[in-house]
C-alpha cells in the first residue's frame, strides 16, 4: 500500500480570484464543471497504452463524482500535449473546457512509472496544481486515482475518495447460492474473492487501516466465528467464538477496541471488546434488541438502534455506555446507523409501511439533532435499500439495493452510491449479486 511515492512539482496558485469558485458539494445541485483530460505524453508505445488508460481512469473518476463533465477528446482543437508547454487557452475555452489536465508517463530505469500532471484554469490562464507520482507498473490505476483525488480536492476543498477499496458480500445468481467475501476498487475494478464460499459469511468490516478486514462466518448454523484476514499476506485467524453474534464488529478510531451486538437470554446487547485482551464489556442493559453499533470519529460516542420503546429507533451513548439519548423520532423503524467520518451526519436505513406495503429508505440526520429538530433527510428509497456506509470524506454514501423476484426472474441485489445531497445515484458494477458494502479509508 506504500508503494506510491509523491514528489510535489508545484501547487502554485490559490483559489483567490478563481473564476469557477470552489464547488459546494453539500448544498443543492450544481451543473458539473467541464474539464478536458488531455492525452498523456509517453516515450514508448507501451507507455502510451498506460497513459491512455490513466486518462480513462481519471476521466471516469471525475465523471462518477457528478461534479465534473469530461469533454470528449474528439472535440479537442489544440494538438500539443504534455507538461512542457503552456496551453493555448483560447482553444480550450472554445470547446467550453473550464479546466484542463495535461500529463505524461515515463518508465524509469528502476522499472517504475513516473506519472506527471498539471491542472490548468483555462479562464484565468493559470496553473492550479501539479505533481509527479512514482509507482510500480502494476499500480498505474492507483496512481490515476491519486491524480483524480488531487483534482477533486483542489476544486472542491474536500479530500478525494477515489483511491479506496470496497469489501462486500458477493452472492452467486445461480443455485445453489454461494456467498463469498469480495474486495474491489471503489469503482468496481479489480474484483477478487477473499473466501471460498463453503460457509455462510456476513458483514465484512475494514479494520482501522485498509490492510485487514473482519467478518462473521457460520461454521455451523449455530456457531458464529469472527475472522480477521490480513489482505497483504492472506493470513486468516479467529478473533473470537461469539455465540449469538449477528454482525461483524465495528472498530474504534484508534483500532484498540471494537463494538458488536450479541444475543443472550432473550435479549440482544451491545458489547465492547478490547482487541488486545479479548475482554468483553457490556454497554447496554434492560430488555429488547440493541444492534448495529457504530463509533463516532473521535471514538467518544456510539450510535446504535434499539427497540426498547417498542419500535427500533436510533440512540447515542458515550463509549462507556453512559448518557443514552434517543435521536430519531419519525414514523417507521430505524436500523443500521453509520457515523460519517466527518462527524456531522449519521446515515441510517428507515422502514416505513403504507397501503402498498413496506418501503425501505436511506436517510441522514445530524449527529446532534437537538440543534435542529428537522434534521432528518431521506436521500433514496426503494423496495430494498439498506446497509449505508460512507466514503472517507463523508460526501458519498454506498448502500445495497434489492429488487423482488418476478415470474421466471429471480430477485437481485446490487451496490449503489449516492451523493450526500440525494443526487447522482449510480450502480457500482459487480460480477454477481452484492450486499453489505463497507468503504475503506484512502489507501496509503
From Swiss-Prot:
It comes from the Bacteria. Pfam families: PD40, TolB_N. Keywords: Cell cycle, Cell division, Periplasm, Signal. It is found in: Periplasm. Residues 1-19 form the signal peptide. GO terms for biological process: cell division; protein import. Gene3D superfamilies: TolB, C-terminal domain, TolB, N-terminal domain. GO terms for cellular component: periplasmic space. Belongs to the TolB family. The Tol-Pal system is composed of five core proteins: the inner membrane proteins TolA, TolQ and TolR, the periplasmic protein TolB and the outer membrane protein Pal. They form a network linking the inner and outer membranes and the peptidoglycan layer. Part of the Tol-Pal system, which plays a role in outer membrane invagination during cell division and is important for maintaining outer membrane integrity. NCBIfam families: propeller_TolB. This is Tol-Pal system protein TolB. It comes from Rickettsia felis (strain ATCC VR-1525 / URRWXCal2).
Amino acid at each position: 500500500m506504500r508503494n506510491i511515492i509523491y514528489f510535489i512539482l508545484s501547487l502554485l496558485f490559490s483559489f483567490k480570484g478563481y473564476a469557477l469558485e470552489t464547488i459546494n458539494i453539500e448544498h443543492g445541485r450544481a451543473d458539473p464543471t467541464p474539464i478536458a483530460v488531455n492525452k498523456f505524453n509517453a516515450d514508448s508505445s507501451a507507455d502510451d497504452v498506460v497513459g491512455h488508460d490513466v486518462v480513462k481512469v481519471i476521466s471516469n473518476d471525475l465523471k462518477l463524482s457528478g461534479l465534473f463533465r469530461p469533454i470528449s477528446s474528439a472535440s479537442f482543437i489544440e494538438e500539443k500535449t504534455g507538461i512542457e508547454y503552456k496551453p493555448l487557452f483560447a482553444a480550450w475555452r472554445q470547446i467550453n473546457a473550464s479546466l484542463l489536465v495535461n500529463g505524461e508517463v515515463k518508465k524509469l530505469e528502476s522499472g517504475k512509472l513516473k506519472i506527471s500532471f498539471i491542472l490548468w484554469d483555462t479562464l484565468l490562464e493559470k496553473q492550479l496544481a501539479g505533481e509527479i507520482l512514482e509507482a510500480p507498473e502494476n499500480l498505474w490505476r492507483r496512481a490515476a486515482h491519486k491524480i483524480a483525488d488531487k483534482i477533486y480536492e483542489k476544486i472542491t476543498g474536500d479530500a478525494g475518495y477515489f483511491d479506496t477499496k470496497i469489501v462486500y458480500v458477493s452472492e452467486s445468481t445461480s443455485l445453489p447460492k454461494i456467498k463469498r467475501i469480495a474486495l474491489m476498487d471503489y469503482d468496481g475494478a479489480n474484483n477478487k474473492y477473499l473466501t471460498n464460499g463453503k460457509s455462510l459469511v456476513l458483514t465484512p468490516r475494514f479494520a482501522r487501516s485498509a490492510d485487514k478486514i473482519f467478518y462473521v462466518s457460520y461454521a455451523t448454523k449455530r456457531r458464529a466465528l469472527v475472522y480477521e484476514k490480513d489482505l497483504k499476506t492472506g493470513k486468516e485467524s479467529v478473533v473470537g467464538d461469539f455465540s449469538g453474534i449477528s454482525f461483524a464488529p465495528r472498530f474504534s478510531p484508534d483500532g484498540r477496541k471494537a463494538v458488536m451486538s450479541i444475543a443472550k437470554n432473550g435479549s440482544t446487547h451491545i458489547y465492547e471488546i478490547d482487541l488486545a485482551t479479548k475482554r468483553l464489556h457490556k454497554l447496554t442493559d434492560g430488555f429488547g434488541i440493541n444492534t448495529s453499533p457504530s463509533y463516532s470519529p473521535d471514538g467518544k460516542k456510539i450510535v446504535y438502534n434499539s427497540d426498547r420503546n417498542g419500535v427500533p429507533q436510533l440512540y447515542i451513548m458515550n463509549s462507556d455506555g453512559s448518557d443514552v439519548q434517543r435521536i430519531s423520532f419519525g414514523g417507521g423503524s430505524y436500523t443500521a446507523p453509520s457515523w460519517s467520518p466527518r462527524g456531522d451526519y449519521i446515515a441510517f436505513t428507515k422502514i416505513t409501511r403504507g397501503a402498498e406495503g413496506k418501503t425501505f429508505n436511506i436517510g441522514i440526520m445530524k449527529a446532534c439533532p437537538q440543534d435542529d429538530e428537522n434534521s432528518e433527510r431521506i436521500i433514496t428509497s426503494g423496495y430494498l435499500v439498506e446497509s449505508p456506509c460512507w466514503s472517507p470524506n463523508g460526501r458519498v454514501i454506498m448502500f445495497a439495493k434489492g429488487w423482488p423476484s418476478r415470474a421466471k426472474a429471480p430477485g437481485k441485489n446490487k451496490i449503489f452510491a449516492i451523493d450526500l445531497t440525494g443526487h447522482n445515484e449510480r450502480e457500482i458494477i459487480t460480477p454477481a449479486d452484492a450486499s453489505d458494502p463497507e468503504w475503506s479509508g484512502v489507501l496509503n
